A protein has these predicted regions:
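Active-site oxyanion-binding pockets that recognize sulfate/phosphate
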Residues: 2-5, 53
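Short, basic/aromatic recognition patches
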Residues: 4-25
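Zn2+-dependent cytidine deaminase-like catalytic core
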Residues: 13, 43-125
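Glycine-centered short loops/turns at secondary-structure junctions
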Residues: 26-27, 99
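Short beta-strand scaffold segments in enzyme catalytic cores
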Residues: 30-36
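Short, glycine-anchored, charge-dense loop/turn motifs used at functional sites
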Residues: 38-42
Length: 125
C-alpha cells in the first residue's frame, strides 16, 4: 500500500476506540494499533497495568507484543504505530527497539497530565 493511501485519522480512531475498551475493562484510557506496510492491522493492545499488576503493560507495549507474536518476529520494520496518547519514554523506546517506522498519536503528554497521569517526571529526567 502506498504511504499516501493510509488513512491516519481512521487508524488513530481505532486506537482511541481501544482506549475506551481499556476504560471499560477497568484500566487506564490508552489504546494502540500497529499496521504493516500494506495497511493491515498486525497488532493491537490497550493498557493493562492495573489489570495485570504490570507497570510495563502500556497499550503500546501490549500492541508491540501482539504484533511480534502475530508475525513471528521482533522486527517491525516498516510498520506504523497509532496510539491514543503520545507514547511515554518507555513505550517510545520499545517502538524504537522494534524498528517501528512511524508513530502517530491523538493526544499529547500534556493532555495526559491534565487527566492525572504523572509522565512528566520521565520526560524531565
Amino acid at each position: 500500500m502506498r504511504q499516501n493511501m493510509i488513512n491516519h485519522k481512521e487508524n488513530l480512531m481505532k486506537a482511541v476506540k481501544l482506549s475506551k475498551t481499556s476504560i471499560d475493562s477497568g484500566s487506564s484510557p490508552f489504546g494502540c494499533i500497529i499496521i504493516d506496510k500494506d495497511g493491515k492491522i498486525i497488532g493491537e493492545g490497550h493498557n493493562r497495568v492495573v489489570l495485570d499488576n504490570d507497570p510495563t503493560a502500556h497499550g503500546e507495549v501490549m500492541a508491540i507484543r501482539n504484533a511480534c507474536k502475530n508475525i513471528g518476529s521482533f522486527d517491525l520494520s516498516g510498520c506504523i504505530l497509532y496510539t491514543s496518547c503520545e507514547p511515554c519514554p518507555m513505550c517510545l523506546n520499545a517502538a524504537k527497539w522494534a524498528n517501528i517506522a512511524e508513530i502517530y498519536y491523538a493526544a499529547d503528554r500534556y493532555d495526559a497530565e491534565n487527566i492525572g497521569f504523572r509522565d512528566r517526571v520521565f520526560y524531565d529526567d
